[in-house]
Amino acid sequence: MFISEIQLKNYRNYEKLELSFEDKVNVIIGENAQGKTNLMEAIYVLAMAKSHRTSNDRELIRWDEEFGQIKGKLQKRNSSLSLELNISKKGKKAKLNQLEQQKLSQYIGVMNVVMFAPEDLNLVKGSPQVRRRFLDMELGQIAPIYLYELSQYQKVLTQRNHLLKKMQGNSKNEETMLDVFTLQLIEHGAKILQKRFEFLHLLQEWAAPIHRGISRGLEELEIVYKPSVDVSESMDLSKIKEVYYESFQSVKQREIFRGTTLIGPHRDDLQFFVNSKNVQVFGSQGQQRTTALSLKLAEIELIYSEVKEYPILLLDDVLSELDDYRQSHLLNTIQGKVQTFVTTTSVDGIEHETLKDAKTIHVTNGTVDCEIDRA
């Protein structure tokens, strides 16, 4: 699949923009704070209905405006689709072929993207929240039911935490309601956990050989899910629910005392092992970056295996963060098969066949000054 054009209105520092793209490689060049990352973000938001940079949708709307809009045309193997996302203070509304979608979960996954930005290099050594977000965003693209379960879980979690804070003063009158929320949380949480196990099993199958190739056969990558309760991938759904129920009973008084939910998918984490050593603790910066690169390349192949089309790859100022060897490995892997967007302050120092026929877009202060095709 590839995006052939995009239109922005009141998005970040863009008042109005219409732009067409090549189906292979597009290089967006500009100094820092001129709008190249905003353009890249707009493509991501059009696909995912949320930003990878902020959870505050108001930041996506141009200063002093009431709404922002992103439109795009997506070309898939057997269809051409128009996508539209309208952002206001009241929330987001999505349209597919001019038809408004009742739920964003019906819209997300139509256009698949993989974002690789400098902050993704922190996937290994960053906080558990970074890794959970990675799971949620990537899994949500290929399993719409996961997004539904996740949104329901988060709603119940908010209600349950509010009740737990209320119960810190007097717990006796609210225990029945707490039990109701707990059962709802278990219902959605168990399904989330099961989907994460399935996804990571597939990701492992793709990431391990990719990592082996980048490390020239010297390193073996293993991805390990670290749940907040004693469950395993081999358990069926009913067993996972049973373990959750027992675990919630055991931490009930502690949760009331602390006023928050202490277990569940929102407390889980991922660990990465290279040659049986925890990369987060014992890995070199090179090993951590190889692991992050392996995961991103695995995402591309995993999405292709599930939807039978390659996703759109967004490389936001990340090539300069990779050494020549990893840079070449990345570009060799995607060459000719993945529509790719690259942002950079300069193409100097990036010598690769992939970029020779790229469309070059120069961005200055929220305007596209010129577009040329590199010879």
Curated annotation (Swiss-Prot):
ATP binds at residues 30-37. CDD domains: ABC_RecF (cd03242). SUPFAM superfamilies: P-loop containing nucleoside triphosphate hydrolases (SSF52540). Keywords: ATP-binding, Cytoplasm, DNA damage, DNA repair, DNA replication, DNA-binding, Nucleotide-binding, SOS response. Gene3D superfamilies: P-loop containing nucleotide triphosphate hydrolases, RecF/RecN/SMC, N-terminal domain. The keyword Nucleotide-binding applies. Pfam families: SMC_N (PF02463). GO terms for cellular component: cytoplasm. GO terms for molecular function: ATP binding; single-stranded DNA binding. One of its GO terms (biological process) is double-strand break repair. It is found in: Cytoplasm. The keyword Cytoplasm applies. HAMAP family: RecF. Belongs to the RecF family. The RecF protein is involved in DNA metabolism; it is required for DNA replication and normal SOS inducibility. RecF binds preferentially to single-stranded, linear DNA. It also seems to bind ATP. NCBIfam families: recf. This is DNA replication and repair protein RecF. It comes from Bacillus cereus (strain G9842). The lineage of its organism: Bacteria, Bacillati, Bacillota, Bacilli, Bacillales. The gene is recF.
